[in-house]
Every structure is written in C-alpha cells, then in structure tokens.
Amino acid sequence: NRAVSNNRLPGSSFKPFVYLTAMERNGFNPASIVKDEPVVIEILGSSPWEPRNFSDKYAGDIILKKAMMRSLNSVSVKLIQEVTPEKVIKAARQFGVTSPLGNNLSLALGTSGVSPLEMASAYSTIANLGIYNEPYFVERIEDFKGNPLYENFYHGVQNYAPKSIYPLLNMMQGVIDGGTGRIVRQMGFKHPAGGKTGTTNNFKDSWFDGFTKDFSTSVWVGYDNNEPMIDRHAHGLTGASAAAPIWTLYMEKALQGKNQIKFSIPEGIKFEKVDVYTGTLADSQSIETMNVAVKEETVILPRAIESIPVELDLIEPSTTSELTNVPNP
C-alpha cells in the first residue's frame, strides 16, 4: 500500500516546513528578502554541495512568498542554514511527519522519505490553521443491532497558533494561483486551495500535495524501481506536469456539489502590498508587486528615501537627515 508505507522523497513539497520554521523561529515573514543565487556548501572530507534551482536561473533579491511560488531551491537551503535542520525536523513532527528525517541541510529539498498519508496529514494541519488531526481509517464499528463497539473520539491538537500558520497558507495559495502549481487553475479548478509541487532528481518522484477547506490530498507518481519518468517527448515528469493534474481531477470529483469555501482569516493578521524584489511597501517604482499576509505586529517599511528620485530642495533638511538612514529590510 504505497499510500501509507511507500517512503519516497518528497522533493520541494517538504519546503513549507522549512519556511514555517524560518518565520516562527527566526523572524522571517512572507515579505522578507532572501537573495536567490547559486549556493556552495563546503562539506568536510567530501566535495562541496552545490544545490541548484530547477531551471538553473536565479532571481537575486526576492521575497519569501514569491520564492515559494517559484520553488527556488537556493532560498530554501539558505533558510535551513539559518534555522538548522534540527528545528525543521521538530516543526515537521508538529505537522504529523513521523518518518525518519535526515539531520542535514539537504532536508530543505525533501531528501528524506515520507508517505503520501503523512503529507496529506501534514498539509491538513495547514488547512486547519495549526490543528493537527491524527489520521485514522475506522470511525465507528457497530454490532448487528447497531450498538457501537468502537468509535474514534480523537480530537485535534492545536500545535500552532492560527496567526502563525495563516501567512504560510496564503503563500501556498499563491503556489496554485500563480506559481508552480498554476496548472490547477488552468484546468478550471475554482475552489480556494493551497498546495506545493515536488520533483526529485532525475524525475524519479512527482508530487502534488494540496488542500481546500474540506480535503487535504497528496498525490505521488513514480516507479517502484526508481526508474526516471520520461514522457514520449523526452521530457521529465514533474510535480506540475504529472501529479498536479491528477490532484485536480480527483479534487474536482471529491468536491462535486460542495460550495467553494474560503479559508477564514484569523485574528492578528493583516495584508500588505509589497515590492517583490525589495520587500518594501509597493510604490510607483515597483516592477512587480504582491499582497502578503503577515502578523499584525509585522512592520513593512517603505522604500528607503535615498533610493527615491526627488527634488532635494523640496525636502526640509531635518526630514532628509532623519529618513536617509532608514535601511532597506
């Protein structure tokens, strides 16, 4: 039964746990800037590890939300370097991941095996705004007279505050609405949803894990013998091209006749429109902007005044000297 016992590498579908750890433990938020660039990590007694982005292209400074939408490997590796693999493992356990996880930096790219059941369970914790529900198969057993012999009375555990999870949930909605999982929308799926693609080296594993308000579903595609998945056009099958379409077709059937329910926005959350490449409040100089969900106490700064072309004689000297020292976040 591959759904429960097939420990396959999740690839980038593991990244949400890295991002959540960085936001909860190290003060990052969806508008935080990380430089997307080639990374070289020295390993004692071995060759350096040089994780690459899928396209081998790099965006430079970019906000976390956009980095997740584009599934940028270098950003995820930089985050786990800062927060440590131990903290990411601890976070994954809070989401219900029970498989052994390697205590190493490559964990950021999903190099430890998990089951689809674990991923569906973990992603349901995001959809439930931090409430973990242990998976179960049998809800109730009755005898021939209808008397209950067994009932499952498990109640969810609030492992994270709702306002801690919602920024991540919003980022994962971005994956579907305009990121690597956009095929879901292109296929006509209308329900509010979040998710994440995953593809492993040499196209041996293709994942799409996603959720709506009603269901959390994990789709894995691959061969038992680890053979690479190559289509008739000699293209490797990715999470977006193989698993996400299956997820979409399944969820369309599962949600047939159900209302399109939006995710509730918890108390303590606000939305800000920011510059994708500076992390500052959007302004007339912004090339690309994006709405991000952040905790109310999060301060998003305007662009530093010295970077805005102005007529200097229109500014009072006291105002200029005060604001030119405001750093770019």
Model-inferred region functions:
Residues 309-328:
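C-terminal functional modules
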Residues 20:
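Extracellular glycan-interaction surfaces
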Residues 46-52, 83-121, 135-137:
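Mid-domain, small-residue-enriched loop/turn segments at the edges of structured enzyme/sensor domains
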